[in-house]
Protein backbone atom coordinates (compact mmCIF):
# COMPACT_ATOMS: atom_id res chain seq x y z
CA UNK A 1 0.00 0.00 0.00
CA UNK A 2 2.81 2.44 0.90
CA UNK A 3 4.70 1.63 -2.31
CA UNK A 4 1.52 2.16 -4.32
CA UNK A 5 0.98 5.60 -2.73
CA UNK A 6 4.60 6.58 -3.43
CA UNK A 7 4.24 5.50 -7.08
CA UNK A 8 1.06 7.55 -7.45
CA UNK A 9 2.75 10.57 -5.88
CA UNK A 10 5.69 10.28 -8.25
CA UNK A 11 3.30 10.02 -11.18
CA UNK A 12 1.48 13.17 -10.08
CA UNK A 13 4.75 15.10 -9.62
CA UNK A 14 6.13 14.00 -13.00
CA UNK A 15 2.82 14.77 -14.69
CA UNK A 16 2.73 18.23 -13.14
CA UNK A 17 6.30 18.95 -14.26
CA UNK A 18 5.54 17.86 -17.82
CA UNK A 19 2.43 20.06 -17.85
CA UNK A 20 4.44 23.07 -16.65
CA UNK A 21 7.12 22.46 -19.28
CA UNK A 22 4.48 22.20 -22.00
CA UNK A 23 2.77 25.41 -20.91
CA UNK A 24 6.14 27.21 -20.80
CA UNK A 25 6.99 26.12 -24.36
CA UNK A 26 3.54 27.15 -25.62
CA UNK A 27 3.80 30.56 -23.94
CA UNK A 28 7.32 31.13 -25.28
CA UNK A 29 6.21 30.30 -28.84
CA UNK A 30 3.29 32.74 -28.68
CA UNK A 31 5.44 35.50 -27.19
CA UNK A 32 8.04 34.97 -29.95
CA UNK A 33 5.39 35.17 -32.67
CA UNK A 34 3.89 38.30 -31.09
CA UNK A 35 7.20 40.16 -31.03
CA UNK A 36 8.12 38.93 -34.53
CA UNK A 37 4.83 40.36 -35.79
CA UNK A 38 5.60 43.68 -34.07
CA UNK A 39 9.07 43.78 -35.65
CA UNK A 40 7.64 43.13 -39.13
CA UNK A 41 5.09 45.93 -38.70
CA UNK A 42 7.77 48.32 -37.45
CA UNK A 43 10.00 47.57 -40.45
CA UNK A 44 7.14 48.24 -42.86
CA UNK A 45 6.21 51.46 -41.07
CA UNK A 46 9.84 52.60 -41.08
CA UNK A 47 10.00 52.08 -44.84
CA UNK A 48 6.79 54.05 -45.47
CA UNK A 49 7.96 56.95 -43.30
CA UNK A 50 11.47 56.97 -44.77
CA UNK A 51 10.37 57.42 -48.38
CA UNK A 52 7.87 60.20 -47.74
CA UNK A 53 8.85 63.30 -49.70
CA UNK A 54 8.88 66.52 -47.70
CA UNK A 55 9.89 70.04 -48.70
CA UNK A 56 13.29 70.67 -47.08
CA UNK A 57 13.27 73.62 -44.65
CA UNK A 58 15.33 76.73 -45.41
CA UNK A 59 18.45 76.69 -43.28
CA UNK A 60 20.72 79.57 -42.28
CA UNK A 61 24.34 78.56 -42.21
CA UNK A 62 26.05 79.07 -38.90
CA UNK A 63 29.04 77.68 -37.15
CA UNK A 64 28.27 74.69 -35.03
CA UNK A 65 30.24 72.30 -32.99
CA UNK A 66 30.68 69.05 -34.92
CA UNK A 67 28.07 66.50 -33.87
CA UNK A 68 28.59 62.82 -33.59
CA UNK A 69 26.55 61.16 -36.30
CA UNK A 70 24.22 58.34 -35.37
CA UNK A 71 24.37 55.47 -37.85
CA UNK A 72 21.21 55.43 -39.96
CA UNK A 73 19.28 52.17 -39.99
CA UNK A 74 18.82 50.63 -43.42
CA UNK A 75 15.34 50.34 -44.91
CA UNK A 76 15.93 46.62 -45.63
CA UNK A 77 15.95 47.29 -49.41
CA UNK A 78 12.16 47.12 -49.54
CA UNK A 79 10.64 48.59 -52.68
CA UNK A 80 7.11 48.55 -51.28
CA UNK A 81 4.76 47.40 -48.54
CA UNK A 82 1.64 45.21 -48.54
CA UNK A 83 -1.00 46.17 -45.96
CA UNK A 84 -4.19 44.20 -45.25
CA UNK A 85 -6.10 45.94 -42.42
CA UNK A 86 -8.76 43.23 -41.88
CA UNK A 87 -6.14 40.64 -40.85
CA UNK A 88 -3.69 43.12 -39.28
CA UNK A 89 -1.00 42.39 -41.86
CA UNK A 90 1.78 44.71 -42.97
CA UNK A 91 4.97 43.52 -44.63
CA UNK A 92 7.58 44.94 -46.98
CA UNK A 93 8.49 43.30 -50.28
CA UNK A 94 11.66 43.27 -52.37
CA UNK A 95 12.57 43.71 -56.01
CA UNK A 96 12.10 40.53 -58.06
CA UNK A 97 15.87 40.15 -58.49
CA UNK A 98 16.72 40.71 -54.82
CA UNK A 99 18.07 37.63 -53.00
CA UNK A 100 15.56 38.31 -50.20
CA UNK A 101 12.65 38.02 -52.62
CA UNK A 102 12.21 34.43 -51.55
CA UNK A 103 9.11 32.77 -50.13
CA UNK A 104 11.27 30.96 -47.56
CA UNK A 105 12.46 34.30 -46.16
CA UNK A 106 9.72 36.77 -46.94
CA UNK A 107 6.68 37.30 -49.13
CA UNK A 108 7.77 36.82 -52.75
CA UNK A 109 6.96 38.92 -55.80
CA UNK A 110 6.44 36.35 -58.55
CA UNK A 111 8.30 36.43 -61.88
CA UNK A 112 6.67 38.48 -64.66
CA UNK A 113 4.77 40.60 -62.15
CA UNK A 114 4.06 44.24 -62.94
CA UNK A 115 4.39 46.95 -60.34
CA UNK A 116 1.17 48.77 -59.32
CA UNK A 117 1.97 51.79 -61.51
CA UNK A 118 1.56 49.69 -64.68
CA UNK A 119 -1.95 50.30 -66.00
CA UNK A 120 -3.92 47.04 -66.38
CA UNK A 121 -0.88 45.11 -65.16
CA UNK A 122 -0.87 42.28 -62.65
CA UNK A 123 1.18 42.10 -59.45
CA UNK A 124 1.35 38.59 -57.97
CA UNK A 125 2.77 37.92 -54.50
CA UNK A 126 3.12 34.55 -52.75
CA UNK A 127 3.71 33.69 -49.10
CA UNK A 128 3.74 30.69 -46.79
CA UNK A 129 0.81 29.69 -44.59
CA UNK A 130 0.92 27.37 -41.58
CA UNK A 131 2.46 28.26 -38.22
CA UNK A 132 6.17 28.88 -38.81
CA UNK A 133 8.13 32.13 -38.56
CA UNK A 134 7.69 32.81 -42.29
CA UNK A 135 3.97 31.92 -42.41
CA UNK A 136 3.15 35.50 -43.39
CA UNK A 137 -0.02 34.58 -45.32
CA UNK A 138 -1.47 32.22 -42.70
CA UNK A 139 -4.63 34.35 -42.39
CA UNK A 140 -5.04 35.13 -46.09
CA UNK A 141 -7.96 32.70 -46.40
CA UNK A 142 -10.03 34.97 -44.12
CA UNK A 143 -10.31 37.74 -46.72
CA UNK A 144 -13.77 38.50 -48.07
CA UNK A 145 -15.09 40.27 -51.15
CA UNK A 146 -14.60 44.07 -50.89
CA UNK A 147 -11.94 43.80 -48.19
CA UNK A 148 -9.22 46.39 -48.75
CA UNK A 149 -5.60 45.67 -49.64
CA UNK A 150 -3.10 48.52 -49.83
CA UNK A 151 0.19 48.55 -51.71
CA UNK A 152 2.65 51.33 -50.83
CA UNK A 153 4.97 51.83 -53.78
CA UNK A 154 6.97 54.75 -55.16
CA UNK A 155 5.35 57.34 -52.87
CA UNK A 156 1.85 56.23 -53.81
CA UNK A 157 -0.72 54.22 -51.86
CA UNK A 158 -2.56 51.89 -54.26
CA UNK A 159 -5.92 50.78 -52.88
CA UNK A 160 -7.37 47.46 -54.06
CA UNK A 161 -10.66 45.74 -53.25
CA UNK A 162 -10.95 41.94 -53.11
CA UNK A 163 -13.01 40.58 -56.00
CA UNK A 164 -12.59 36.83 -55.43
CA UNK A 165 -11.26 34.39 -52.84
CA UNK A 166 -10.98 30.91 -54.32
CA UNK A 167 -8.88 27.74 -54.37
CA UNK A 168 -7.16 25.90 -57.22
CA UNK A 169 -5.27 22.62 -57.42
CA UNK A 170 -1.73 22.85 -56.09
CA UNK A 171 0.28 21.87 -59.16
CA UNK A 172 2.72 24.75 -59.59
CA UNK A 173 0.41 26.67 -61.91
CA UNK A 174 -2.13 29.29 -60.81
CA UNK A 175 -5.10 29.76 -63.12
CA UNK A 176 -6.02 33.44 -62.93
CA UNK A 177 -9.26 34.50 -64.59
CA UNK A 178 -9.36 38.29 -64.45
CA UNK A 179 -10.61 41.41 -66.17
CA UNK A 180 -7.61 42.43 -68.28
CA UNK A 181 -8.94 45.98 -68.45
CA UNK A 182 -8.25 46.42 -64.73
CA UNK A 183 -5.05 46.79 -62.72
CA UNK A 184 -4.87 43.58 -60.73
CA UNK A 185 -3.33 42.26 -57.52
CA UNK A 186 -3.05 38.53 -56.79
CA UNK A 187 -2.02 37.13 -53.41
CA UNK A 188 -1.57 33.38 -53.02
CA UNK A 189 -0.65 30.77 -50.42
CA UNK A 190 -1.28 27.11 -49.57
CA UNK A 191 -4.62 26.06 -48.12
CA UNK A 192 -4.80 24.79 -44.55
CA UNK A 193 -4.61 21.14 -45.60
CA UNK A 194 -1.79 21.94 -48.09
CA UNK A 195 -3.63 20.27 -51.00
CA UNK A 196 -4.95 23.46 -52.62
CA UNK A 197 -3.71 26.93 -53.46
CA UNK A 198 -5.64 29.90 -52.02
CA UNK A 199 -5.94 32.75 -54.53
CA UNK A 200 -7.01 36.29 -53.66
CA UNK A 201 -7.91 38.39 -56.70
CA UNK A 202 -8.23 42.16 -56.17
CA UNK A 203 -8.68 45.17 -58.45
CA UNK A 204 -7.31 48.68 -58.09
CA UNK A 205 -10.01 51.16 -57.06
CA UNK A 206 -8.01 54.24 -56.06
CA UNK A 207 -4.54 55.63 -55.49
CA UNK A 208 -3.27 58.52 -53.39
CA UNK A 209 0.11 60.14 -52.96
CA UNK A 210 1.69 60.05 -49.52
Identify the residue ranges that each predicted region occupies:
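Juxtamembrane low-complexity tails/linkers enriched in Ser/Thr-Pro and polybasic
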Residues: 1-5
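Solvent-exposed, non-transmembrane regions of membrane-associated and secreted proteins
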Residues: 6-210
Amino acid sequence: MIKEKISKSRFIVIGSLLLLIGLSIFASYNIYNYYSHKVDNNKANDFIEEIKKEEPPVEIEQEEQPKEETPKEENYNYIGVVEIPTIDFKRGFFNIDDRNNNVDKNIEVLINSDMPDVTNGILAIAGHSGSGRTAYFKNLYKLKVNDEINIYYNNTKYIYKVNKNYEVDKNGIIDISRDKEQTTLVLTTCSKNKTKQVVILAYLVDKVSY
